[in-house]
Amino acid sequence: MPKSKVRKKNDFTISPVSRTPVKVKAGPSSVWFVALFVGLMLIGLIWLLVFQLAATNPVDAPGMLQWMADLGPWNYAIAFAFMITGLLLTMRWR
């Protein structure tokens, strides 16, 4: 049986893949970043609790927050905006 001819590798060569590790551009998040997003989520939670407990009392009740009661359903939007902002910041946390 005849032997096959061996090809010459002069036609083209494939360059080897670089195996050097690539450095990550940014390091871990700082402490203030963690405090910021946790704080924003807690502010939103506290806003909801205060609205439910202090602003929904009967009219002229002691301890009623009139300015918060005047906002009405916008209190939910404000509280959830704080919480969602904190949640979005957690996605940037390293």
From Swiss-Prot:
The keyword Iron-sulfur does not apply. The keyword Ribonucleoprotein does not apply. Keywords: Cell cycle, Cell division, Cell membrane, Membrane, Transmembrane, Transmembrane helix. One of its GO terms (biological process) is cell division. It is a multi-pass membrane protein. HAMAP family: CrgA. This is Cell division protein CrgA. The gene is crgA.
